[in-house]
């Protein structure tokens, strides 16, 4: 469907959430590989792809036709998913919301950390702020509410949870997710990659 004057939104329907996610990621990969004239950017999320284009070079109808032709086609080459092992200092000044998350779940802070570490978090897409890996697969026993009031500044590397999702803030920015830890690592995962968090006891000197 048209989405403004220079974009088309394609939404997957039917099947499981995993199947819808796989379908939109595959569609985005095929269109990107084809280097379609006029297409400027592709934003693939859980069940939709936003195809942004230069309206001086192509039209809604042409882009929609391209999407229909690409749907269901196999990706010519795929990159195996990477597993990222990410060190995290949990709690304290680096994870000030960990006690609140524990209360919400009826667990101890240590138990929350244990479940967070045991989870193989799957990167579904990168979002805002730019490049933030949006992950799911939570083993926590319930969804987590957002903060009542968003923070005006969340430090770079903060590890946060909300709902049944997890994110790492790649840059300092405002945010309303619950901060449970912080990592000194810099990573650039792609959709489909897996993130495993590993607890460390102190923030590295000089970072």
Task: Show the residue positions of the predicted features.
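Glycine-rich active-site loops that engage anionic ligands at enzyme catalytic sites
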Residues: 1-207
